[in-house]
């Protein structure tokens, strides 16, 4: 069967790109190839796409999936990203992923352009924001999940022909979720900054949604998993104050509106010195954004504003082992936060370090840590670089924790789509239990290379087993790769 010539060209070009990117570059050393890792991190997002895939899709083992999402609610909820190694669309981590993709794009724009990856970054971001726009059909309605998480996790099926139920879950005034609405507002506002130079109309649309969602979050307090209990066992929320601060900080940066700055100034809780920066804890992100305002002289270096800045710097000093409550390190030098999926916290901490280094350099200032030591911008960037080097292979196991980077990387990440033969190679349906029998329990490497994925990482003693069943250490997710993308751009 013949095809339109342009489509054939795109397909051939895509195959060539993927083949080239799958060729490894030899043993990993301290001299990591950050540009290569940056390129591959963006490919990971293409592997996580849900919905109708575009003609320029570069990860060719994936196919269209979940094309009826939202039909139960008579809303188009196709698109977006699967959060990790399952076939779920969880709105809470998806919104945080979107915010971090946007922050990476805004903060590291020149570096991304220098490596010819700015366009791919905006494409990854737009795949998320297009979905979030559809998920917000009314001012006080936001769809926060597609799929039954318990039923999804009970099956091992690729997304292209999964048969698990796809119910849609939403928050509204009767079923509030200020954390989910606030995080989505932050995502929309941050993304508006990324798109403003190239698509002002789209940026205005995003700002409009962000403003509505912020008001929705303020007017109807509460944690979202009380309204969407199905999410509670997977992405439970610890509160919503941080999301409101985070959203206010991004809306102020995007609009300059004093209203949002007032929210930051009048907030009763600035978060204190945080122990992590993650999908459930955005206090540090808000603190870093306020510190930027202080450095630039846009707010006075006093009161609540200096409190935000001081708390951000306490976190940084703790990462640098010069604070009151230093972050633990593995024997190999990895910042160690929590046993489950530790690299997500390493990635976000490294992003905070790299971003704060940029702010310090621009202000020609430094950080005075509690032990009396002074941290320069270069110290922060060097620490972030050391963490990336560890992730890319400069560690006791000499293993890259980015799939497809180097020669020694995880071959069995906990990921349904990657671990099951591509539907393009074998269209025979994979059943719920059949997937476990034929693929999950198969000791062989995954048949599809999940290029650019970052697994959960080693344990606190630098050990890693590369077992598909070890989801605590072996499952990649979007909330890790989005911030790491920004760090890679900063140091490439």
From Swiss-Prot:
Report the record's Gene Ontology biological process terms.
cell wall organization; cellulose catabolic process
Instruction: Please indicate if the UniProt record lists Signal as a keyword.
Output: yes
Name assigned to this protein: Endoglucanase 15
Q: Name one GO molecular function term.
A: cellulase activity
Instruction: Report the top EC class in one word.
Output: hydrolase
Top-level lineage group: Eukaryota
Leader sequence segment = 1-30
Biological source species: Arabidopsis thaliana
Q: Which pairs of positions does the record mark as disulfide bonds? A: none
Q: Which GO terms describe its cellular component?
A: extracellular region
Q: What is its EC number?
A: 3.2.1.4
Matches recorded under InterPro entries = 6-hairpin_glycosidase_sf (IPR008928), 6hp_glycosidase-like_sf (IPR012341), Glyco_hydro_9 (IPR001701), Glyco_hydro_9_His_AS (IPR018221)
In which compartments does the protein localize? Secreted
- Catalytic reaction annotation: Endohydrolysis of (1->4)-beta-D-glucosidic linkages in cellulose, lichenin and cereal beta-D-glucans
Predominant location of this chain? secreted
Q: Which UniProt keywords apply?
A: Carbohydrate metabolism, Cell wall biogenesis/degradation, Cellulose degradation, Glycosidase, Hydrolase, Polysaccharide degradation, Secreted, Signal
The record's Pfam families line, in alphabetical order, gives:
Glyco_hydro_9
What family is this protein classified in? Belongs to the glycosyl hydrolase 9 (cellulase E) family.
Q: Which residues form the active site?
A: 86 (nucleophile), 414, 466, 475
């Amino acid at each position: 069967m013949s095809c339109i010539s342009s489509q054939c060209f795109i397909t051939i070009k895509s195959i060539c790109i993927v083949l080239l990117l799958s060729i490894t570059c030899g043993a990993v050393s301290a001299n990591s190839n950050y540009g290569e890792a940056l390129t591959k991190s963006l490919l990971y997002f293409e592997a996580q796409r849900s919905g109708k895939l575009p003609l320029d899709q570069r990860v060719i083992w994936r196919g269209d999936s979940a094309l009826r999402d939202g039909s139960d609610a008579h809303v188009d909820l196709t698109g977006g990203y699967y959060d990790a190694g399952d076939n779920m669309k969880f709105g809470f981590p998806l919104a945080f992923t979107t915010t971090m993709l946007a922050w990476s794009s805004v903060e590291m724009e020149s570096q991304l352009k220098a490596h010819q990856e700015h366009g791919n970054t905006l494409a990854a971001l737009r795949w998320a924001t297009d979905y979030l726009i559809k998920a917000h059909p009314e001012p006080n309605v936001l769809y926060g999940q597609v799929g039954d998480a318990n039923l999804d996790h009970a099956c091992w099926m690729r997304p292209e022909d999964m048969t698990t139920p796809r119910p849609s879950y939403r928050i509204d005034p009767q079923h509030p979720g200020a954390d989910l609405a606030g995080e989505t507002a932050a995502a929309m506002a941050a993304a508006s900054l990324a798109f403003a130079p190239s698509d002002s109309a789209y940026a205005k649309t995003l700002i409009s949604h962000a403003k509505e969602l912020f008001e929705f979050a303020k007017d109807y307090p509460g944690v979202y998993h009380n309204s969407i209990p199905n999410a509670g066992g997977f992405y439970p929320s610890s509160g919503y104050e941080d999301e409101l601060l985070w959203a206010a900080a991004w809306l102020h940066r995007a609009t300059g509106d004093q209203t949002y700055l007032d929210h930051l100034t009048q907030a009763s809780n600035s978060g204190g010195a945080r122990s992590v920066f993650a999908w459930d804890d955005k206090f540090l992100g808000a603190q870093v954004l306020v510190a930027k305002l202080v450095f630039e002289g846009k707010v006075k270096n006093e009161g609540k504003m200096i409190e935000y800045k001081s708390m951000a710097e306490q976190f940084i000093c703790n990462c640098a082992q010069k604070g009151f409550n230093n972050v633990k390190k593995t024997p190999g030098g990895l910042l160690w936060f929590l046993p489950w999926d530790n690299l997500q916290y390493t990635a976000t901490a490294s992003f905070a370090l790299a971003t704060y280094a940029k702010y310090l350099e621009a202000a020609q200032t430094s950080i005075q840590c509690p032990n009396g030591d002074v941290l320069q911008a270069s110290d922060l960037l060097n620490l972030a670089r050391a963490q990336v080097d560890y992730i890319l292979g400069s560690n006791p196991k000499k293993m890259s924790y980015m799939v497809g980077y180097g020669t020694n990387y995880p071959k069995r990440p906990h990921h349904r789509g990657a671990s099951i033969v591509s539907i393009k190679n074998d269209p025979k349906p994979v059943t719920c239990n059949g997937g476990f029998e034929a693929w999950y329990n198969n000791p062989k490497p995954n048949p599809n290379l999940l290029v650019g994925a970052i697994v959960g990482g080693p344990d606190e003693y630098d050990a890693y087993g590369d077992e598909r069943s070890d989801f605590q250490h072996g499952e990649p997710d979007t909330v890790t790769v989005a911030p790491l993308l920004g760090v890679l751009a900063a140091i490439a």
